[in-house]
Amino acid sequence: MSLLSAIDTSAASVYQPAQLLNWVYLSLQDTHQASAFDAFRPEPPAGAAPPELAFGKGRPEQLGSPLHSSYLNSVFQLQRGEALSSSVYRNASPYGSLNNIADGLSSLTEHFSDLTLTSEARKPSKRPPPNYLCHLCFNKGHYIKDCPQARPKGEGLTPYQGKKRCFGEYKCPKCKRKWMSGNSWANMGQECIKCHINVYPHKQRPLEKPDGLDVSDQSKEHPQHLCEKCKVLGYYCRRVQ
C-alpha cells in the first residue's frame, strides 16, 4: 500500500495503465530482492556496529576519498553476489531439477501408454458384408481371422495341421514367385529356387480331391489313405497275396 500511495497522480495521468502496472511490478520485485539480500546478510556480533556504521568510523578526509568509496562498493557487491548465489543454489538445486524432469518423463510415458491401451481396446472390429461366409465355421457375421474356432496365432505354420501329405500352394514373399507342390506337409516349408529362403504354404488341400475336402476338418479321412481300387480304408487290392 505504501508503494501504491507513493505513486504521483501526475505520473498516473501521464503513463498508460499497462505501463503503470509494469512499473509497480518492477518496484515490488526490487523490494523482494532487497529483502532477500538482507536475509542472507550475516549478523554482526554482539556489541559491534553495523558494517555501514563501522565503515563510517573514520576521519572525514578518509570518508570522502575515492579509495574508500570504491572499497565500500566492492564490499556491497560481494555481499550481494554471495546472497544471490546462495539463494539461487538453495532454490534451484541441480538434483532437484533432474528429479523433476525424470518424474515428468515417467508420468508422460504412463499417460501415453494408457492412451495406447485404451485406443486399442476401444477399436471396434470391422463387420464383413452381409453375404460374407466364414470358411472355417461356415457362419456369417465375422471374418475368418476373427472366427472363434480359429487356431491361436503361432500354433501352426501351415493351414493344415494333420499328419498326411497334401497339395500346397506357395508364394515367395521376396520375389513374389508362385508354385505348387504335391509334397506338402504340416509345419514344413519349401525353399524358393530363386531367393533360397524357406517358404511355408498359404493354402493346402488333399492330393486326390483338390476342391472337395475341407482341410480344417481333421475328423475326415483323406482319400490318399483309401484303397486305390475299391476305395475302402485299410485294404490294398493291388498288394500281391
UniProtKB/Swiss-Prot annotation:
Provide this UniProt record's keywords sorted from A to Z: Metal-binding, Phosphoprotein, Zinc, Zinc-finger
Pfam hit, one = zf-CCHC_2
Q: Which domain of life is it from?
A: Eukaryota
- Residues found modified as Phosphoserine: S65, S93
Presence of keyword Phosphoprotein: yes
MF term (GO), any? zinc ion binding
Protein name as catalogued: Zinc finger CCHC domain-containing protein 24
Query: Which gene name belongs to this protein?
Result: Zcchc24
